[in-house]
Amino acid sequence: TGASYGIGFAIATAMANCGATIVFNDIKQELVDKGLAAYKEAGINAHGYVCDVTNEDAVNEMVKKITAEVGHINVLVNNAGIIKRIPMIEMTAAQFRQVIDVDLNAPFIVAKAVIPDMIEQGGGKIINICSMMSELGRETVSAYAAAKGGLKMLTKNIASEYGKYNIQCNGIGPGYIATPQTAPLREIQPDG
């Protein structure tokens, strides 16, 4: 998820260079088209799908399409995410819920959709992109830090619950990486 640009695109490109077939999604067709163009420019044949990963029915439908059109999902990278840099007391509950929905609920929904096929295949890998904010927190990122902290624990629970099916689930908690999403913060805090 979230592999049209930025960290997700870099991860998918590295995986493609190791022989993986790349399948990605984004919430809008124009973003899928941009992603497909970027993969083509990089010499990678990728498959793109439009899907709102916070919508369980849409995710289940997308996973069915991918399995039918491309094949089994052996590796899932849950990378889609958003951040709202708003002081906590200025953030509305709706804004807080939106971040939790994309950064925590969506990885749950997508993992839940692919795990049955992974069990049937005899295993698989799930990689959740967490964040150093899951450990640290910082001003103006309360929803993001809460979501990534929850994702870290979800990762541990998936690993514990589905390891017996040869499904490994790991989290990666990168620090600040220069992407369009982190550009506003770099302007405010150039030292990270």
Positions of predicted regions on the chain:
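Active-site helix of classical SDR
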Residues: 111, 147, 155
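Residue(s) in the substrate-gating loop at a strand-loop-helix junction
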Residues: 131
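Active-site loop immediately N-terminal to the catalytic Tyr-X3-Lys motif
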Residues: 86-89, 136-142, 164-165
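A glycine/serine/threonine-rich, flexible loop-to-helix segment
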Residues: 164, 176-192
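Canonical Rossmann dinucleotide-binding motif of NAD(H)/NADP(H)-dependent dehydrogenases/reductases
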Residues: 1-22
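Substrate-binding pocket helix/loop in short-chain dehydrogenase/reductase
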Residues: 87-88, 95-100
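Alpha-helical segment proximal to the catalytic Tyr-Lys
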Residues: 116, 160-164
